[in-house]
Amino acid sequence: MDRSGFSDFHVHSALSDGADAPEAIIERAIELGMPRLGLSEHSFAPYYADHSLDAQARKDYIALMSRLKEKYRGRIRLFCGIEQEYSCPINAEGFDYVIGSVHYFMLDGDC
């Protein structure tokens, strides 16, 4: 299938709940001819702590994406995104875009 011109902005790596390292995902997107790719790791949620970014991991992710944007410049346009759970505080600083999501509903203070 020809994926030239196709972009994906809802991609999770092993930094949250995906299986592959960010660079492996980027390399595959380049192989497929994708001109743009947005990684969108999960924002921190206490009920999803093993698969979401805490404050330090969030900073590390933004820094990593900055380095990868430079490394892959001219081969693919990269975007640093975050998938933000509706029930958690929003901090979009450092991100190119935010995906709003609802994974859990709060009922009487519990998920």
Task: Describe the predicted segments one by one.
Residues 86-93:
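Catalytic cores of alpha/beta
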Residues 1-84:
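An N-terminally biased module of ancient metal coordination in phosphate/nucleic-acid-related enzymes
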Residues 107-111:
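Acidic/polar active-site rim loop that often engages polyanionic ligands
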